[in-house]
């Protein structure tokens, strides 16, 4: 039997997934069923693009529900404050300066289930996070990214 994949995440990330799951089950699922019912009323389903679209959306919603349920069931809650030992760990917020241009960037390192680059949350599986994990404040690190090496100096590590 295959081992279930573990999804490291913060309590905040788990709560966000639980809210999304609730929304999908109580609102989105009903909306899609209603769209299917309306599309069926148009008659011939063989050339009914509204029906096809609604069925595609239903498949997406049901797939997302299954995915989220699996992530929640296999969640490994990370307490960043507890894990913070002076080194960059999952759940920490890290501020670093790109060398030599001095551009400052700040990211929170989270599990892949809650990564959202638009909110400054990057997956622990991303090249930047992998390059930062295990290092300490003041350290200069070379991070290997698809675009090439990135040299940074870690300025600040905080528990999120």
Curated annotation (Swiss-Prot):
Q: Which gene encodes it?
A: greA
Q: What is this protein called?
A: Transcription elongation factor GreA
Extract the PANTHER family matched here: TRANSCRIPTION ELONGATION FACTOR GREA
Coiled coil: which residue ranges?
A: 10-37
Tell me, what is an example of a GO biological process annotation in this record? regulation of DNA-templated transcription elongation
Q: Which family, according to UniProt?
A: Belongs to the GreA/GreB family.
**Which GO MF terms are attached to this record?**
DNA binding; RNA polymerase binding
Q: What does this protein do?
A: Necessary for efficient RNA polymerase transcription elongation past template-encoded arresting sites. The arresting sites in DNA have the property of trapping a certain fraction of elongating RNA polymerases that pass through, resulting in locked ternary complexes. Cleavage of the nascent transcript by cleavage factors such as GreA or GreB allows the resumption of elongation from the new 3'terminus. GreA releases sequences of 2 to 3 nucleotides.
Q: Give me the segments passing through the membrane.
A: none
Q: What is the scientific name of the source organism? A: Listeria welshimeri serovar 6b (strain ATCC 35897 / DSM 20650 / CCUG 15529 / CIP 8149 / NCTC 11857 / SLCC 5334 / V8)
Q: Which UniProt keywords apply?
A: Coiled coil, DNA-binding, Transcription, Transcription regulation
Note whether Transferase occurs among the keywords. no
Record keyword Transcription present = yes
Q: Which InterPro entries match?
A: GreA/GreB_C_sf, TF_GreA/GreB_CS, Tscrpt_elong_fac_GreA, Tscrpt_elong_fac_GreA/B, Tscrpt_elong_fac_GreA/B_C, Tscrpt_elong_fac_GreA/B_fam, Tscrpt_elong_fac_GreA/B_N, Tscrpt_elong_fac_GreA/B_N_sf
């Amino acid at each position: 039997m295959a081992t279930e994949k573990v999804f490291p995440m913060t309590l905040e990330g788990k709560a966000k997934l639980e809210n999304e799951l609730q929304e999908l089950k109580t609102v989105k699922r009903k909306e899609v069923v209603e769209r299917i019912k309306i599309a069926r009323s148009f008659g011939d389903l063989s050339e009914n693009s509204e029906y096809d679209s609604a069925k595609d959306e239903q498949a997406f919603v049901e797939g997302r529900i299954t995915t989220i349920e699996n992530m929640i069931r296999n969640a490994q809650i990370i307490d960043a404050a507890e894990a913070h030992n002076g080194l960059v760990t999952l759940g920490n917020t890290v501020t670093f300066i790109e060398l030599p241009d001095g551009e400052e960037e700040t990211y929170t390192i989270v599990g892949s289930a809650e990564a959202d680059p638009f909110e400054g949350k990057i997956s622990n599986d991303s090249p930047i996070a992998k390059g930062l994990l295990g290092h300490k404040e003041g350290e200069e690190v070379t991070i290997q990214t698809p675009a090439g090496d990135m040299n940074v100096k870690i300025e600040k590590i905080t528990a999120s």
